[in-house]
């Protein structure tokens, strides 16, 4: 006699396609369990032998609220299951370079929350060093650093094994050289050698003949204005050098650019700390500031100053009046910073950027900003708590895909190239909890 068939799934919500209807032989149904999961934010039901596999549940999940900005993303993460198994809080800290984007994606109405299950600590922007230290001592769930944590970069804490951590590009930006000479000094040009000489104390005045020559000579409008600073003995003619007093990945990118430019006496700041007078930099009229926000404020408040700051900070209302120097590209052309010129640098570098090959300096091409940088998010490769593991890597996957188009450009960053987003996902898929991958694909 033919085995009778038994309907085991309801037809409710069939019009919207929210529940999959399955028809199985009644004899087989006794050995299977009904399990559910969200796929593309819709319920999907399935039958499995004995128990629900990872990513499925006997409890029917509720569709998540729409992720703010997800439809605007340049990259897609729709094939990644963003469900988090339980409520979880994540501790975060690190690079001030990242602060604007971290802020908008972890707090407020635009934040990633996985349907309200994920909350983030406040982001104090303590600097890249604090991000690396916090992730290795266990006080953070996600650390952020402009410079990846590697022995080659001199940023690997003592006793730490690099292979125990996964590092992914979080955002793409560029550092700029800002200055404050008051009005009448727009479009100042500085060579890498001149910037190095300023920080080494060789050039101490804005009226220096080398700077005047770079800016059209003594007969040019800008050259005359610079020369007049010295002739009139104006206080702002004395260059006030500003540097990052705490561990800073922006400092690392800045010093690496100068090092790559071939300036004698310049080397990448291995610990990403630029020391003051008598230390790594020989300038004597020098002051330290806390972070990128402090650097922008310091330049804005100090006549005669020079400093280096992440590009997005000069776009913040209140900082927009900061003058930014033009720099030379690899072809010797004078370039102004923009999302386009920073993006061109990343495009020229291609997909070769990894934690062991992270610098983007003096790439070939037209309108290429001479030093751009990826900032990195760091998580342990093995995380004991399953919910923490899933929340950490799913947030980072969401941010490196959806978050790029929705938020990165608006905050003054260049959206990650698609190839870099794919690289980030591949790395995140190696993070596990109890040997099980935490970034699971929908099916």
Stretches found by the model and what they are:
Residues 22-24, 29, 45-46, 432:
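Processing junctions and N-termini across compartments
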Residues 29-41:
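Secreted, propeptide-processed cysteine-rich mini-domains
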Residues 1-27:
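Secretory targeting and sorting signals
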Residues 40-67:
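Extracellular/mature segments of secreted proteins
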Residues 63-443:
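Flexible loop/hinge segments at secondary-structure junctions
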Residues 34, 51, 91:
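Conserved beta-strand positions that form and line the central face of beta-propeller blades
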């Amino acid at each position: 006699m033919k085995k009778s068939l038994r309907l085991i799934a309801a037809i409710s919500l069939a019009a919207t396609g929210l529940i999959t209807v399955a028809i199985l032989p009644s004899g087989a149904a006794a050995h299977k369990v009904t399990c559910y999961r969200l796929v593309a934010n819709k319920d999907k039901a399935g039958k499995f032998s004995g128990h629900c596999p990872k990513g499925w549940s006997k409890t029917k999940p509720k569709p998540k609220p729409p992720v703010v900005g997800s439809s605007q993303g340049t990259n897609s993460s729709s094939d990644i299951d963003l469900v988090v198994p339980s409520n979880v809080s994540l501790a975060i800290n690190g690079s001030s370079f990242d602060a604007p984007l971290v802020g908008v994606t972890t707090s407020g109405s635009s934040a990633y929350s996985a349907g309200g299950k994920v909350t983030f600590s406040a982001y104090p922007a303590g600097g890249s060093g604090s991000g690396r230290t916090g992730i290795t001592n266990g006080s953070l769930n996600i650390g952020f650093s402009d410079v990846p944590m590697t022995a080659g970069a001199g940023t690997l804490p003592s006793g730490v094994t690099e292979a125990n951590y996964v590092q992914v590009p979080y955002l793409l930006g560029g550092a700029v050289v800002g200055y404050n000479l008051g009005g009448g000094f727009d479009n100042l040009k500085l060579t890498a050698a001149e910037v190095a000489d300023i920080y080494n104390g060789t050039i101490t005045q804005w009226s220096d003949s080398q700077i005047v020559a770079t800016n059209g000579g003594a007969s040019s409008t800008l050259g005359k204005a610079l020369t007049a600073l010295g002739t009139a003995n104006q206080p702002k003619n004395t260059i006030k050098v500003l540097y990052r007093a705490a561990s800073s990945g922006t400092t690392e990118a800045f010093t690496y650019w100068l090092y790559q430019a071939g300036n004698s006496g310049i080397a990448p700041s291995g610990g990403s700390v630029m020391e003051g007078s008598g230390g790594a930099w020989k300038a004597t009229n020098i002051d330290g500031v806390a972070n990128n926000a402090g650097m922008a404020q310091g330049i804005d408040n100090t006549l005669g100053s020079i400093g280096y700051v992440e590009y997005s900070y000069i776009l913040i209302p209140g900082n927009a009046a900061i003058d930014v120097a033009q720099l030379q590209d690899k072809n010797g052309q004078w370039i102004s910073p923009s999302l386009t010129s920073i993006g061109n640098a990343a495009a020229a570098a291609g997909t070769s950027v990894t934690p062991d090959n992270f610098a983007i300096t003096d790439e070939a091409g037209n309108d290429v900003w001479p030093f751009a940088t990826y900032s990195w998010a760091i998580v342990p490769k093995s995380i004991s708590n399953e919910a923490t593991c899933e929340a950490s890597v799913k947030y980072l996957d969401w941010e490196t895909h959806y978050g790029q188009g929705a938020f990165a450009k608006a905050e003054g960053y260049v959206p990650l190239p698609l190839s870099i987003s794919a690289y980030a996902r591949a790395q995140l898929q190696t993070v596990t909890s109890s040997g099980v991958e935490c970034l699971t694909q929908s099916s």
